[in-house]
Amino acid sequence: MAILPLLLCLLPLAPASSPPQSATPSPCPRRCRCQTQSLPLSVLCPGAGLLFVPPSLDRRAAELRLADNFIASVRRRDLANMTGLLHLSLSRNTIRHVAAGAFADLRALRALHLDGNRLTSLGEGQLRGLVNLRHLILSNNQLAALAAGALDDCAETLEDLDLSYNNLEQLPWEALGRLGNVNTLGLDHNLLASVPAGAFSRLHKLARLDMTSNRLTTIPPDPLFSRLPLLARPRGSPASALVLAFGGNPLHCNCELVWLRRLAREDDLEACASPPALGGRYFWAVGEEEFVCEPPVVTHRSPPLAVPAGRPAALRCRAVGDPEPRVRWVSPQGRLLGNSSRARAFPNGTLELLVTEPGDGGIFTCIAANAAGEATAAVELTVGPPPPPQLANSTSCDPPRDGDPDALTPPSAASASAKVADTGPPTDRGVQVTEHGATAALVQWPDQRPIPGIRMYQIQYNSSADDILVYRMIPAESRSFLLTDLASGRTYDLCVLAVYEDSATGLTATRPVGCARFSTEPALRPCGAPHAPFLGGTMIIALGGVIVASVLVFIFVLLMRYKVHGGQPPGKAKIPAPVSSVCSQTNGALGPTPTPAPPAPEPAALRAHTVVQLDCEPWGPGHEPVGP
């Protein structure tokens, strides 16, 4: 009994003396190797043939390697709660889709490898939560688009960004300009055709920029490139020097690249692709004096143009130079014109006024400028009063003006000018419409020898029922054209125009050949086929008639057979009446005729046809009946 109090005193001390138990770790995924005995915890599954991220991952892991598998997507729950993960490798899988917020819990992640996959775009939410990311490797994908906010969460911490070997034609340069801590930027082997000026000006820590094998023809100067090592510097550039690689681009070696040529180096193999005189030459071997530009020269411009108010007008200006000049337009009031609700400026130098107003008239100035200078040209536009309103079936109009190659008669006037009634002589004998039927008409016009350089003819026509013009382009050697698919019983207004090249301006112009009016013949109303309901009723009636006739014939046959058998059913044979062997009788008294014995029943096969044979002798004068 003395031992019991002692045990009761020692019982509270038992838990304190037992060793502490740790939380049960998650089992290691199949085909993976897990290092859980020492920190940091690692889960290594390279080349394990995985089709998805294993669900039984140890959420305490600091390193997760899933490279060289067949993972097709990364879902939101795949990496949830892995707040201590530092390194994640998903290289060389088949990933096409990354769910928005898939990395949201990886706030401690330092390196993310997604190279060698099949990503086509990177949205704003796919990298959300990576606030400590330093290395982002996205090379060897199929990226064609990168959202402007895709790198917002890691913009201040990112040090290494690799976008090489993708299909990028454009980049969010504003977003890249905010990567203030980036040291290495890989943009090589993409489809970049241009880099905006100042794109790298804020990347003060950038040490390596790779733009090899893109489509760059020029590289604009940037303050960043002042840190490029000069040829006079000894080997071993200083730590602050920038390593720039831009070989494999079709560089256009003109005055725009003189700044780069002055930073001569001896360790790169860039070459010139154009102009032809410098094509194929080593970039650093071309002298600075050969990097020249040509000032712009205006080669074509629109002649003086007159249009009625309310109509559109197109002003054209063409210029050549090296580099290709940019064309701008200045209004008569001195304003620089651009795209607006009333005007559109095209890259080829065309200014289109959608709706002209009386105040738009005056001298428009075309300015062509490039790095070597600028050139100007004046184009006069006259805006007249608006034309009087005309109906689609109007028969009076002003004749087309001659000598104005760029003035195309308005559609309503062109379709009505020089119209020809179908029954009267044509007003314009240049165009004739013959052999017109219900849906076709033959258009003929004479040879236009006074107009040199005709490229083609244009036929435009519309019917009296609508204002929609239909156009047909005809080869220059043709003098006739058969119009088909016309509507019957309608009146058509038609005009033929010659399309030629104006030798004075070098622009394409049109000149009316003539117009005509004709009417198609009304279509004969064909005998319409019976309607489907009618055809169906006829078939039903015919089928019913056949059935009724068949029933009647069947009944008639039964009646005939019934009559032949004497009113007895054909299955029962008629019992023949007793037949006497007496052929005749006399008026004399005769003895009683003996009653013959009843005949034997006939065979069943002969019941239907009974044959009675009478064996009689001739009876007449001198003959007496034969007694029994």
UniProtKB/Swiss-Prot annotation:
GO CC term, one of those recorded: presynaptic active zone membrane
Main location class: membrane
Membrane spanning stretches: 540-560
Ranges of residues in domain Ig-like: 295-382
Region Disordered, residue ranges: 382-430
Keyword terms: Cell adhesion, Cell membrane, Cell projection, Disulfide bond, Glycoprotein, Immunoglobulin domain, Leucine-rich repeat, Membrane, Postsynaptic cell membrane, Repeat, Signal, Synapse, Transmembrane, Transmembrane helix
Membrane topology: Single-pass type I membrane protein
Domain LRRNT: residue ranges: 19-59
PANTHER family xrefs: LEUCINE-RICH REPEAT AND FIBRONECTIN TYPE-III DOMAIN-CONTAINING PROTEIN 3 (PTHR45842:SF5), SYNAPTIC ADHESION-LIKE MOLECULE SALM (PTHR45842)
Domain notes: Lacks a cytoplasmic PDZ-binding domain, which has been implicated in function of related Lrfn proteins.
Protein name: Leucine-rich repeat and fibronectin type-III domain-containing protein 3
Source organism of this protein record: Homo sapiens
Species lineage: Eukaryota, Metazoa, Chordata, Craniata, Vertebrata
Protein's gene: LRFN3
